[in-house]
Amino acid sequence: LEFRRVLFRSIGIDLGTSAVKLLLMEESGKICNIVSREYPLFFPHPGWSEQKPEDWFAQSMEGMKELTKDIDRAQVAGIGFGGQMHGLVTLDKDDNVIRPAILWNDGRTGEETEYLNTVIGKDKLSQYTANIAFAGFTAPKILWMQKNEPENFKKVVKIMLPKDYLAYRLSGSFCTDVSDASGMLLLDVKNRCWSKEMLEICGITEEQLPKLYESWEVVGTLKPEIAKELGFSENVKVVAGAGDNAAAAVGTGTVGDGQCNISLGTSGTVFISSKNFGVDENNALHSFCHADGSYHLMGCMLSAASCNKWWAEEILQTKDFAAEQAPIQKLGENHVFFLPYLMGERSPHNNPDARGVFFGMSMDSTRADMTQAVLEGVAFGLRDSLEVARNLGIKIERTKICGGGAKSPLWKKIIANVMNLKVDVLENEEGPSMGGAMLAAVGCGAYPDVETIGKKFAKVVDTVEPDPELVAKYEERY
């Protein structure tokens, strides 16, 4: 038996906004290799954001070859996904991509979002899908395409999400999972099925939409020509995978009831898993299906670590984040504030036109004060979402943290005190790619369910405790 254990490996593919990150995992949870490959983002007009699905596929294939170059490729048993949510990928009758994918952070659908929220109405949307319309969601993008690109819209035979395009190219299975589908505004989240009413509103049919699976379910095996190109067995199982946030939650063990995870990636999220389906009355948080078979609430900030990246790289012209943070000493006493709305905002303000602001500067404000304000501004933004969940009566005393921004000790300390939570730091912070590999392991039968593997793999190595004095200072500033 021990011999077999080494022979089982799964691959997690995290299809991100700036790069695809691939992770190779042994059954024990040991990470054997990680590879990242970038692809371009296109901004054809202000506020638009697009990518070419072919780029995702090409870089994922190259990435898998690189990832497995030093192992016996016959050991690869399963492939799972985490991926950027909400993006609209459309294929024609010959399976060609009709137009570049319109991404989650694309802001062109203001009118369509407004139409859904006012003409159809938030109450109806919430009743059909447990959510209201956000500019980033998929349904408004479909309406936009219908109105602005009718020729393209007529050609649409398949509508899918970004990671589902990879699953389709690898396995030939036209599928999605319920966690990712929750962000389309086409899913009846409570009952985990497509909403007939929403399809009608968007002028599409169920045939154009992928078959729904739970995240760990096997959707197919590798196409023979793909297996051959990669040097993998044709029996490699492809599982449905999950949206990036649900996949990251699996990767960090945020499964089961009342668990919390904060992700500091390009966007920032507060993710709370719950056995019970629930919706807050103002729809300030997303209410989605979770990858473990249950539900979750999620607040999403459109700019989180990207605020810090923009501040350091664009404005200060440096990539040395640690050096910029080093002089910051006094927490809770900063007179400079930053509103982190560089791309508009989702939770809980839902305003695509919101913009970033620095205020409170005086002649003695320093570079470090402004850097600190950026870090604090993001933490305050995340707290907005936490407060909504607390008002729903969900008890949250600690949170896990992951994402690029979580590498900064200072930022973790700020978050612990702004949110008054114990912040658990995990041994590995691989998030969605790890979650994808774990879902594949469950799909291949190596583990009985997602909760088991989630609890087993998430190892807390450090906890940042809030300091009551700082908590009080930040409370005042919040």
Residue locations for each model-derived region?
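Gly/Ser/Thr-rich active-site cleft segment
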Residues: 17, 125-243, 308, 340-343, ...
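N-terminal phosphate-binding loop and adjacent alpha-helix
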Residues: 35-74
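ATP-dependent carbohydrate kinase catalytic cores
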Residues: 137, 185-292, 303, 319, ...
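Phosphate/pyrophosphate-binding loops at sites that engage ATP/ADP/AMP, CoA/4′-phosphopantetheine
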Residues: 60-77, 149-153, 196-206, 228-230, ...
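A polyampholytic, Gly/Pro-enriched intrinsically disordered region
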Residues: 56, 118-134, 231-233, 258-261, ...
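Glycine/Thr-rich phosphate-binding loops that ligate phosphate moieties of nucleotide
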Residues: 8-36, 43, 77-118, 151, ...
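Short, small-residue-biased leader/transition segments that mark boundaries at the very start
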Residues: 1-7
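Active-site nucleophile and cofactor-binding loops and adjacent substrate-binding regions
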Residues: 29, 51-53, 77-83, 102-105, ...
